[in-house]
């Protein structure tokens, strides 16, 4: 692999970006103790200071470009690791490429939509509108975005995770088999299980499981890149 050192530095920056996105999600989706959920509505939204939502958007705007640096190096590493004559490898590499780029767009899009819904609810809560009217407005707003949000979530999580696991199982990515768990789909599922505990600090921790999954995947990819041979330049013969 050419520029191996640069690739590893970019992947490290990508991990930093994913960590910043985790902080953004904790700021906006860690609702704290005694939060009750009513459909899409969180009872603690009005209690949360507006600065948390504002910082959340700023963190995502800063973290996603850093994450993209790692994501594009991850795509390159997967492309170089596939077998040239394998159709399945080619398809999975293309799936990984597409879904990693979707994850970059999706982190901004999904975070922006969900934070906007929380802000709208918080602002309407301070008006004279009835509670039922507020819920109707907020849920109607969400359903306008539901299809693209759901599509980005499914493709960015499932596509990257399944294709990444494929390359580990078939030993194209040279990492331990435990890294099969290091992907956003598995972390998302683990987060949903944590939410079932109803223990508020576990529920709050689960808010950042998706970027945590991407962080772990980049870490596994970085280990793989470290094991890849350095491409040597061919000497020109006179």
Predicted regions, residues:
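Intrinsic disorder in cytosolic terminal tails and internal cytosolic loops
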Residues: 234-238
């Amino acid at each position: 692999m050419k520029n191996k050192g640069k690739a590893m530095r970019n992947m490290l920056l990508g991990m930093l970006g994913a960590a910043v996105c985790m902080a953004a999600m904790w700021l906006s989706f860690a609702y704290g103790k005694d939060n009750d959920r009513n459909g899409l509505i969180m009872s603690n939204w009005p209690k949360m200071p507006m600065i948390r939502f504002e910082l959340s958007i700023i963190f995502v705007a800063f973290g996603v470009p850093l994450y993209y640096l790692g994501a594009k190096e991850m795509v390159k590493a997967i492309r170089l690791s596939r077998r040239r004559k394998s159709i399945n490898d080619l398809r999975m590499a293309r799936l990984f490429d597409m879904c990693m780029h979707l994850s970059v767009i999706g982190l901004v899009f999904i975070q922006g939509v969900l934070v906007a819904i929380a802000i709208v609810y918080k602002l309407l809560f301070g008006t004279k509108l009835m509670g039922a009217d507020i819920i109707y407005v907020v849920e109607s707003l969400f359903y306008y975005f539901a299809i693209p949000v759901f599509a980005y979530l499914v493709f960015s999580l499932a596509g990257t995770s399944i294709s990444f696991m494929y390359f580990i199982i078939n030993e194209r990515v040279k990492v331990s088999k435990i890294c099969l768990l290091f992907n956003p789909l598995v972390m998302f599922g683990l987060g949903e299980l944590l939410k079932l505990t109803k223990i508020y600090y576990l529920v709050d921790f689960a808010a950042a499981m998706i970027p945590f999954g991407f962080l772990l995947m980049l870490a596994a990819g970085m280990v793989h890149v470290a094991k890849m041979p350095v491409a040597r330049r061919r000497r020109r013969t006179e």
